[in-house]
């Protein structure tokens, strides 16, 4: 059967019942004709000067034009609590189980996410209460919307202290999955590209992004409020997935990898040598307490925080971030960091191995003297008790592990460079309490040479007041 329905063109004004302060203008007409299973529509409607103060929302104009089996719509100057939005699109008017949008273009000159969320929160207060679920195991219904082809173009997006510019991407929606493809944007003075998809029912999020020229210091400060932690210019690549409504759910479900490369940067307090050397076992040892103050003051003028490159790969699974590994190249200190970080407990458990220039290790006093590589050279003035205890502050590792510690960034060859290892463990919110252990590293040959030398030191004669190895040797020879 066929039908023909026509309304009369008439301008009108009114308000929305649920929002007493609202107002709008409406005019237009529509024709419906053809078969019921495939009706054709002509005409259109125009909404003007919509204002809903309760939602902090205004709309200058919205047009709906029927084109037979489809309709074009346009939203002009939609303001959401100070954020503007322009929307254009086309959807099918044919009867279907899904609302099919063939084209959807969204643009904005300024979008403040936090203020827009305020609009959303206000709207939820007016939404009808959701009926109780009949079964805890019942699955949410599929979203009956398909977006075949769309785009976003946002000149500026602000959330918190994060300011993102020139965001462009293609968008689509099908089978509950919202896709953002060919994303291009500028953030933290750098460029970000990639693809993002999200299942709107399960909240599963897949993120594949690459970044170049990112200001790390700005990113950490603006995004996480972390000041003086790390600086430099970064490139990164992510291939991760996560889901969940809470931070705990998201971190526990987080899977995938993040690779990064930071150039010409600087560590915060953690990279200062005085904070690395003064580990818990050094602080608590009676062997170094009298000399510790002088050692620390001598190190404060040495800059070990700068690096030419910091790079690595992070892998995520079951709430744990694994460093596989992370390395840094500095002029006088290079690092090899491996271990894991518990994202839920904010807890670190890592080993930091370092190559340190000999000119710096020479400033470490008795701590530097018990390095197996230096022990024989510095032994003459070394306390005999300290010398015999060297093995407590030394760890022997295979040659291949030793060679994995990076060289210096300036390609300077320092054959007398020393290597040490830190055990970093504890609450990341207390960075200066994390360094539990400091030990010199030695190959089997270096370690055995030191052991042989210490074993060759004669025992002091009875009643001797000699304290250094040199004094003991002189007494015995006498």
Set out the residue ranges of the language-model regions.
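Short, small-residue-biased leader/transition segments that mark boundaries at the very start
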Residues: 2-5
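Flexible, solvent-exposed coil segments and beta strand-coil junctions
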Residues: 8-12, 41, 65-70, 147-150, ...
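Transmembrane beta-strand segments that form the barrel wall of outer-membrane beta-barrel proteins
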Residues: 9-15, 44-49, 70-78, 151-155, ...
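Extracellular loop and loop/strand-boundary signature of outer-membrane beta-barrel proteins
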Residues: 16-18, 222-227, 298, 439
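Solvent-exposed loop/turn segments connecting transmembrane beta-strands
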Residues: 20-25, 52-56, 79-86, 159-163, ...
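Flexible beta-edge/linker motif
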Residues: 31, 90-116, 146, 248-250, ...
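Tryptophan-anchored aromatic micro-motifs
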Residues: 45, 106, 147-157, 257-265
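Extended terminal
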Residues: 66, 76-85, 90-96, 104, ...
């Amino acid at each position: 059967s066929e039908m023909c329905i026509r309304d009369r063109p008439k301008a009108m004004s009114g308000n929305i019942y649920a929002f007493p302060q609202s107002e709008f203008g409406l005019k237009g007409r529509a024709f419906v004709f053809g078969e019921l299973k495939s009706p054709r529509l002509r005409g259109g409607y125009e909404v003007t000067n919509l204002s809903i103060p309760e939602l902090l929302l205004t709309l200058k104009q919205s047009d709906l034009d029927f084109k037979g089996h489809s309709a074009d719509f346009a939203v002009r100057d939609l303001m959401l609590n100070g954020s503007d939005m322009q929307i254009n699109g086309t959807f099918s008017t044919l009867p279907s189980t899904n609302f099919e949008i063939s084209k959807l273009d969204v643009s904005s000159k300024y979008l403040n996410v936090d203020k827009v969320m305020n609009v959303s929160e206000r709207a939820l207060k007016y939404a009808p209460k959701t009926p109780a679920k009949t079964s805890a195991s019942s699955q949410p219904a599929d979203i009956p919307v398909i977006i075949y082809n769309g785009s976003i173009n946002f000149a500026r997006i602000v959330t918190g202290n994060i300011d993102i510019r020139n965001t462009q991407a293609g968008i689509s929606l099908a089978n509950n999955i919202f896709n953002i493809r060919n994303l291009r944007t500028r953030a933290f003075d750098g460029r970000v590209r990639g693809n993002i998809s999200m299942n709107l029912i399960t909240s599963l999020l897949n993120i594949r992004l690459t970044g170049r020229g990112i200001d790390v210091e700005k990113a950490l400060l603006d995004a996480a409020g972390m000041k003086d932690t790390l600086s430099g210019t970064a490139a990164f690549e992510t291939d991760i997935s996560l889901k969940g409504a809470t931070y705990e759910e998201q971190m526990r479900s987080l899977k995938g990898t993040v690779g990064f490369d930071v150039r010409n940067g600087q560590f915060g307090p953690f990279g200062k040598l005085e904070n690395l050397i003064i580990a818990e076992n050094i602080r608590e040892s009676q062997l170094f307490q009298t000399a510790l103050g002088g050692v620390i003051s001598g190190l404060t003028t040495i800059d070990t925080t700068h690096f030419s490159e910091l790079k690595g790969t992070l892998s995520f699974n079951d709430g744990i971030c694994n460093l596989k590994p992370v390395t840094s190249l500095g002029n006088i200190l290079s690092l090899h960091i491996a271990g894991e970080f518990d994202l839920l407990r904010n807890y670190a458990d890592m080993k930091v191995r370092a190559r340190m220039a000999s000119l710096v290790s020479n400033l470490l006093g008795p701590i530097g003297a018990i390095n197996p590589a230096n022990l024989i050279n510095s032994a003459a003035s070394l306390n005999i008790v300290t010398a015999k205890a060297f093995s407590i502050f030394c760890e022997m590792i295979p040659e291949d592990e030793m060679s994995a510690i990076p060289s210096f960034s300036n390609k300077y060859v320092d054959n007398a460079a020393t290597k040490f290892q830190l055990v970093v463990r504890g609450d990341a919110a207390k960075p200066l309490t994390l360094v539990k252990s400091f030990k010199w590293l030695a190959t089997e040959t270096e370690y055995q040479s030191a052991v042989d030398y210490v074993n060759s030191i004669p025992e002091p004669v009875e009643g001797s007041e000699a304290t250094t190895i040199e004094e003991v040797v002189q007494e015995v020879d006498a």
